[in-house]
Amino acid sequence: MSFRNSSRMAMKALRTMGSRRLATRSMSVMARTIAAPSMRFAPRMTAPLMQTRGMRVMDFAGTKENVWERSDWPREKLVDYFKNDTLAIIGYGSQGHGQGLNARDQGLNVIVGVRKDGASWKQAIEDGWVPGKTLFPVEEAIKKGSIIMNLLSDAAQTETWPKIAPLITKGKTLYFSHGFSVIFKDQTKIHPPKDVDVILVAPKGSGRTVRTLFKEGRGINSSFAVYQDVTGKAQEKAIGLAVAVGSGFIYQTTFKKEVISDLVGERGCLMGGINGLFLAQYQVLRERGHSPAEAFNETVEEATQSLYPLIGKYGLDYMFAACSTTARRGAIDWTPRFLEANKKVLNELYDNVENGNEAKRSLEYNSAPNYRELYDKELEEIRNLEIWKAGEVVRSLRPEHNKH
């Protein structure tokens, strides 16, 4: 469809939605709010001023939930509460990088544990971590740490657990950012020690986004959970750490709910499902005689550049109100058909996540010695699909690339 956002229709949308306003910034400005930051940082930066208000009970469509905010944990409280702790970041991938730098910038005592002289070790040095002072091999970091933040990949956690487990001694805290290893313990063989707090903080975004939003003084939404509370302080510890690593708003969940919703989301609307829908529509348009440019524009470009940002900022109803009456009528009429078709697939997906089939598939694939080669091959196949080749050209024609 065409995105017919005339002045008349914009005013109608404004009347429909009350005081909310149409986004006026260019898409390039919107994109900058989620852009990946540079991987090089100064050794330390001053933590940005956070705009927060405290814990409150909020009504989510009739269900009341507690939501914690950063103001419960100002920087001074964080530093005092964790003054006797050493946060050991195990793994320096996406989450290790973002969470580690944020906690360090909050003034906490943070060290990093990775394989010596590997790519992550070298990246950590570039980011200001000092070998022998704040950067150590994994086992040494665990011995030195009091809060062990296991941010390795799921497959790597399974592989390294036999060596890590004996080092997580009484009095330490075991921290995860994903419930995978603990909930699917029959496959991962990860059984946390009985005499330590086991907690989870799961940022709702990549580690790069965690870092970017922190540097902008905002903060990412995160969930927290307690699997095992030995000290009686596991919950407050989890919330404090959530703030320390850059969270703005923090929601309570369980390890099981976190991992199931996460895996379903990634395979569904967030990545797999939307990719499948993009491909299906593009292929139908091409098979029916439309050009690659037209098919891509009506499938991906208009969605990501015009419509999805409005949904993210104001909601689906606002996006509908900003479009033509013809577009709205068709969207509303066809929604039940797509809902019916997709619920069947999503229920099948949920079952496969809940019964451990997806965990088994993930561990087997990502533990294979040649998994990187297989993964690169799959990405290359995606990259070479006509839809994304056409997309490269369409993106090059965006206004921000053609300033004269």
Curated annotation (Swiss-Prot):
Record: residues binding Mg(2+) 1: D262, E266
KARI C-terminal knotted domain residues: 254-401
Residues annotated to bind NADP(+): 91-100, 115-120, 153-157
Pathway, per record: Amino-acid biosynthesis; L-isoleucine biosynthesis; L-isoleucine from 2-oxobutanoate: step 2/4; Amino-acid biosynthesis; L-valine biosynthesis; L-valine from pyruvate: step 2/4
Organism: Schizosaccharomyces pombe (strain 972 / ATCC 24843)
Highest rank taxon of the organism: Eukaryota
UniProt family annotation: Belongs to the ketol-acid reductoisomerase family.
GO molecular function, one term: ketol-acid reductoisomerase activity
Reaction catalysis annotation: (2R)-2,3-dihydroxy-3-methylbutanoate + NADP(+) = (2S)-2-acetolactate + NADPH + H(+); (2R,3R)-2,3-dihydroxy-3-methylpentanoate + NADP(+) = (S)-2-ethyl-2-hydroxy-3-oxobutanoate + NADPH + H(+)
Upper taxonomic lineage: Eukaryota, Fungi, Dikarya, Ascomycota, Taphrinomycotina
Domain KARI N-terminal Rossmann: 63-253
NCBIfam families per UniProt: ilvC
Keywords: Amino-acid biosynthesis, Branched-chain amino acid biosynthesis, Magnesium, Metal-binding, Mitochondrion, NADP, Oxidoreductase, Phosphoprotein, Transit peptide
Listed GO biological process terms: isoleucine biosynthetic process; L-leucine metabolic process; L-valine biosynthetic process
EC number of the protein: 1.1.1.86
Gene3D superfamilies reported for this sequence: N-(1-d-carboxylethyl)-l-norvaline Dehydrogenase, domain 2, NAD(P)-binding Rossmann-like Domain
Main location: mitochondrion
Annotated positions of the Phosphoserine modification: S261
Subcellular locations according to the entry: Mitochondrion
Pfam families cross-referenced by the UniProt entry: KARI_C, KARI_N
The protein's name: Probable ketol-acid reductoisomerase, mitochondrial
Binding site for substrate: S324
Binding-site residues, Mg(2+) 2: D262, E298, E302
